[in-house]
């Protein structure tokens, strides 16, 4: 915990030296600042999680990340773990972690999930996966759509480029309540609603 609050100001300074970060929609974060929520960003670069952490560093988060994120290099792997990153491998232990995360959200913690499941290719948004909405339904928390845009010709991350981090209007928890685990119609509607919101965030 102490190490987190030492590292994040350092990361904030380093990231603001390396990139021109512009945050939009802070008022939407204020709507969920007193309760648990899930932040659901688009995914372009391996370092996308850091942009979310440094633009909301006052609230410690649980970060769901694929194992590839921990394989970039040892230093980044250590940093991500210090920031609360949980490696997603699909193991039985992960089920326990998810249960603990759901309970943490109920207790007021913020969860960061990249719903696309992998990084975008050729500036094309990918449809969000269902896991985000299942967790939101179990925890009973709002989902905050987020889009990360790199102002470069190909939309890829480049050092010293302008980076827009846009937070949208929270999607209310009541929207995710499901009558049963196989309520596919509602899942499809929520996935499309999030994708449509991302498209409008330009």
Residue ranges and their predicted role:
Residues 14, 56, 80, 104, ...:
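A generic structural signal for well-ordered alpha-helical segments
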Residues 1-20, 71-83, 156-162:
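Alpha-helical membrane-targeting segments
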Residues 23, 79-80, 143, 167:
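Structural signal for hydrophobic
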Residues 96-202:
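Non-catalytic C-terminal accessory region of glycerolipid acyltransferases
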Residues 31-92:
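Catalytic core of membrane glycerolipid acyltransferases/transacylases, capturing the structured
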Residues 14, 82-88, 115-118:
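Short, basic, glycine/proline-bearing loop/turn elements
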Residues 4, 11-43:
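Helix-to-loop junction immediately C-terminal to a conserved catalytic motif
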Residues 20-24, 92-97:
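Glycine-rich, highly charged phosphate/nucleotide-binding loops
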């Amino acid at each position: 915990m102490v190490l987190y609050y030492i590292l994040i100001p350092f990361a904030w300074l380093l990231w603001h030296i390396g990139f021109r970060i512009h945050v939009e929609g802070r008022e939407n974060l204020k709507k969920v600042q007193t309760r648990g929520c899930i932040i659901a960003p688009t995914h372009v670069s391996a370092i996308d999680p850091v942009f979310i952490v440094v633009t909301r560093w006052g609230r410690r988060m649980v970060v769901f990340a694929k194992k590839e994120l921990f394989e970039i290099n040892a230093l980044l792997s250590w940093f991500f773990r210090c920031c609360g990153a949980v490696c997603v491998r699909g193991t039985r232990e992960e089920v326990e972690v998810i249960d603990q995360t759901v309970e943490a959200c109920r207790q007021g913690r913020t969860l960061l999930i990249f719903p696309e499941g992998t990084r975008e290719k050729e500036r094309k948004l990918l449809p969000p996966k269902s896991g985000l909405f299942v967790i939101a339904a179990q925890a009973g928390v709002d989902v905050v759509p987020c889009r990360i845009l790199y102002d470069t010709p190909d939309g890829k991350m480049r050092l010293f480029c302008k980076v827009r981090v846009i937070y949208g209007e929270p999607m209310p928890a009541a929207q995710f309540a499901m009558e049963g685990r196989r309520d596919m119609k509602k899942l499809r509607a929520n996935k499309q609603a999030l994708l449509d919101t991302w498209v409008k965030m330009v």
